[in-house]
């Protein structure tokens, strides 16, 4: 009697979801279940391809029960079961994203307020600059109330669902289009293909969800007017769309889009470049299979790449803030040069410290939430969110 255990439907679907949502280094799903031992051997690379807040090597728990001798030719899971599993993963991933984003929302709002305070001062919505993260928290709670720290979070949570759906739609297409392999085509072709596919997929997804990011930014920076008893500029998410379309048209919702696409490529280039260079040097010997070492390295590299590309984020958000204003930046280059000329280079990094705190808070919450899911459901559903 054949003692080989064949994978269950759920295990096959878990393998498909894992392959479709991780690094370009993994092959696309071709309809057959491949030996999980292959992926376990390659687990050291690509664990942080989506974000530092995702649990590294989280997906391997679902494949651990499948023996490495599993048959390479198996009957595919029925479509309805596959969709059901996908829907559960998608929705639970949304809950996970909502939990982490909501927990870190106060830090995120403070980051955006500090980052865009100079534009707010120009428009009369801020009387004086913030002295730091603590001062921003204190003044925001005093002037607007504790609940205002979550202003703009709804748009940020909503943004997760179309982003993930679009990522599933675009990622495999561009992965096949730029199908370079490191061992076959060499490092630089693989690296260039990784940048191209990631940038193209990111820009394609961004085209559909950018207006939500714009609305989130405007709501988060909508502090009450500096004058006593001042009112807010926007009454909610729908009001942002209505007023922006009335004053600037569709272009107002997409101000800063071009530089955002550049930012995706710059970030991915820095991230994969640093990770691929540092991992073989630092994670050696006993450190190679260390969860903690992998997590710390991924977190440090993610924050390093985010810090290096932070000026691009500042420029795009400062451009967003000019929608509805009489005076606007002519282009991202004009915005960059004006900020440097009038405010100095330090202004491009305002709020960067909050970014690091946000990553810590999000990672801590997700770690706890993952543990809760293991207890309740027996598996983890990652947020995958950007």
Curated annotation (Swiss-Prot):
The chain crosses the membrane at residues 86-113, 154-178, 187-207, 257-278, 292-312, 352-372. A motif (Nucleotide carrier signature motif) lies at residues 316-321. Keywords: Antiport, Membrane, Mitochondrion, Mitochondrion inner membrane, Repeat, Transit peptide, Transmembrane, Transmembrane helix, Transport. The keyword Cytoplasm does not apply. Solcar repeats lie at residues 84-177, 189-281, 289-375. Pfam families: Mito_carr. This is ADP,ATP carrier protein 1, mitochondrial. It comes from Gossypium hirsutum (Upland cotton).
């Amino acid at each position: 009697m054949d003692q080989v255990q064949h994978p269950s439907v759920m295990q096959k679907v878990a393998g498909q979801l894992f392959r479709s949502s991780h690094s370009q280094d993994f092959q696309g799903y071709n309809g057959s279940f491949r030996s999980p031992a292959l992926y376990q051997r390659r687990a050291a690379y690509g664990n942080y391809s989506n974000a530092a807040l995702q649990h590294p090597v989280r997906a391997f728990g679902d494949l651990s029960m499948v023996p490495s001798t599993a048959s390479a030719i198996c009957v595919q899971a029925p479509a309805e079961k596959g969709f059901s599993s996908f829907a559960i993963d998608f929705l639970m991933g949304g809950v996970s994203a909502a939990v982490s984003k909501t927990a870190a929302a106060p830090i995120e709002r403070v980051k955006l307020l500090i980052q865009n305070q100079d534009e707010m001062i120009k428009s009369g919505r801020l009387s004086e600059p913030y002295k730091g993260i603590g001062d921003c928290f204190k003044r925001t709670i005093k002037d607007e109330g504790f609940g205002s720290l979550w202003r703009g979070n709804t748009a940020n949570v909503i943004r997760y669902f179309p982003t993930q759906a679009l990522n599933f739609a675009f990622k495999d297409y561009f992965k096949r289009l730029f199908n370079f392999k490191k061992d076959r085509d060499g490092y630089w072709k693989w690296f260039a293909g990784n940048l191209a596919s990631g940038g193209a997929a990111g820009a394609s997804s961004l085209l559909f969800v950018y207006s939500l990011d714009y609305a989130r930014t405007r709501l988060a920076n909508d502090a009450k007017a500096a004058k006593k008893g001042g009112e807010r500029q926007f009454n909610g998410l729908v009001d942002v769309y209505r007023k922006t379309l009335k004053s600037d048209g569709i272009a107002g919702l997409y101000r800063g889009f071009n530089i955002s696409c550049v930012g995706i490529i710059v970030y991915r280039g820095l991230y994969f470049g640093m990770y691929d260079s540092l991992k073989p040097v630092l994670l050696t010997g006993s450190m190679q299979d260390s969860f903690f070492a992998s997590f710390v390295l991924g977190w440090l590299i993610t924050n390093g790449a985010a810090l290096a590309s932070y000026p691009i984020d500042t420029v795009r958000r400062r451009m967003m803030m000019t929608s509805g204003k009489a005076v606007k930046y002519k282009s991202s280059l004009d915005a960059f040069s004006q900020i440097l000329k009038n405010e100095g280079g330090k202004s491009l990094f305002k709020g960067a410290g909050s970014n690091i705190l946000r990553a810590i808070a999000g990672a801590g919450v997700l770690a706890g939430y993952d543990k809760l899911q293991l207890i309740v459901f027996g598996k983890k559903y990652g947020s995958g969110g950007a």
